[in-house]
Amino acid sequence: MIKLVAFDLDGTIGDTIPMCLKALKKAVTPYVTLNDVSENDILETFGLNEKGMIKKLVGYNWENALDDFYVIYEQMHIMCPRPFDGITELIEKLKKKSILIALVTGKGEKSCAITLRQFNMDTCFDKVKTGNPFKNNKAENFRELLADYKLQPDEMIYIGDTVSDIVSCREVGIRCLSACLLYTSPS
């Protein structure tokens, strides 16, 4: 029996990835001296939180770039003002069935809080687990949730959107449901 459903944030709760890429590029570009930062350069740092991503992209002066990122990210969030249709209703239905709801994201605490506030979801989750600057820590966060709630892996499901989400789930023995919620044009 499922007792805990955990969600990823970027690409699962909302279409925030394009905005994240633009905000990161805008924040780090003034601090990169050798080359322009490409979208690919940024994508290669995914799995780390924004502090780790920016440190890797900028090196020296990363603190200033990180401060800039938070300002830019909050300003740009108008590009993604709400979660995917049906997400908040799904969470409410699960809660009515007494299922625990968690958020496990690679984002750092501050950018996660900005997004949840923008989506008016800052009180939706029983627990929020964020990323770290050194490595993808989702498997570790899953283990912590299982321990916190004294659950077995088969009592938890994670809803994510990347191959790395599947890998992290398999590492811990929990099921991963893959979300493909991106809006596409009719053409």
Please give the residue ranges for each predicted region.
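Short, acidic loop-to-helix structural element flanking the phosphoryl-transfer center
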Residues: 75-103, 109, 113, 139
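Conserved small/polar residues in nucleotide/adenosyl-binding loops
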Residues: 183-187
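Acidic di-acidic motifs
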Residues: 16, 160-161
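N-terminal helical cap/lid subdomain that shapes the substrate entry/recognition surface
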Residues: 2-9, 13-88
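Substrate-recognition "cap/lid" segment bordering the active-site pocket of phosphatases
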Residues: 79-80, 109-157, 163-172
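Short secondary-structure boundary segments
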Residues: 106, 180-182
